[in-house]
Design a protein with these regions (language model features):
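Amphipathic alpha-helical segments used for helix-helix packing
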Residues: 64-70, 100-128
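Hydrophobic alpha-helical segments that form the core
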Residues: 143, 152-174, 184-191
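Amphipathic alpha-helical packing segments from all-alpha helical-bundle domains
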Residues: 107, 120-147
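Short amphipathic alpha-helical segment with a characteristic S/N-K-E followed by hydrophobic residues
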Residues: 38, 61-66, 76, 89, ...
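Short, basic, alpha-helical segments at the C-terminal edge of helix-turn-helix-like DNA-binding modules
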Residues: 41, 70-77
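Basic, helix-initiating cap at the start of DNA-binding domains
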Residues: 1-34, 38-47, 53, 64
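Hydrophobic alpha-helical connector segments
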Residues: 77-109, 160
Length: 201
């Protein structure tokens, strides 16, 4: 889970944020109750009380809908920088862990990963739309931190992101939020060490 997705908009269709939210919530609830495979467009429409055509006008299919429902769990609420990099990295770690540990995310992510294995182009588009804004936010955080001597000026931002995402995702899928505070502090400490390491090293 990274940045929040938004409903895909068709040409000429006015946005209806309330309907979008209704459908995304229904999708999350079905993922928790029935699992990824059983969460179909028809089932979501029934639960949300809308017709399937309303969903297809916003999302091209189930996978796109589930992606947006999962990304909506963190709603792009990137932590507000505190001025202390270690504190900020801890906040980022907690955000990633709790979003990925949400029951809907734990239900959806294995199914999505299986589909991405067979469709690398869709996964690449997802990365561009979902992860790039988060990487940019991290880059801005680390740039400011470097100016105050808390990070290396040329630290590897994408490596930090991959470490953050991979560690929290695996932990969330296998342990949920068990011992979350201790885990988050250990990961934040490791991220802090990476941030202080120049790429040239």
């Amino acid at each position: 889970v990274t940045a929040a997705g938004t409903a895909r908009t068709g040409p000429g269709r006015p946005r209806d944020p309330q309907l979008d939210a209704l459908v995304l919530t229904a999708t999350q609830e079905l993922l928790v109750r029935d699992g990824y495979q059983a969460t179909t467009i028809a089932a979501v429409a029934r639960r949300a009380g809308v017709v399937t055509t309303s969903i297809y006008r916003r999302w091209p299919g189930k996978r796109a809908l589930v992606e947006d429902a999962i990304f909506a769990l963190d709603t792009e609420n990137h932590p507000v920088p505190s001025g202390d990099l270690r504190t900020d990295l801890l906040a980022w770690t907690r955000l990633f862990l709790h979003a990925a540990a949400h029951p809907a995310a734990r239900s959806a992510i294995p199914g999505l990963l299986s589909e991405y294995h067979d469709d690398r182009e869709s996964y690449r588009r997802l990365l561009d739309g979902g992860e790039r804004p988060t990487i940019q936010a991290l880059r801005e955080l680390l740039t400011v931190a470097a100016e105050s001597g808390q990070a290396a000026g040329d630290c590897d931002v994408e490596a930090i992101f991959e470490f953050l995402r991979g560690a929290t995702l695996m932990r969330a899928l296998t342990h949920g939020t068990e011992d979350a505070d201790h885990f988050s502090r250990r990961i934040a400490d490791a991220l802090y060490a990476v941030a202080q390491t120049p790429t040239s090293d």
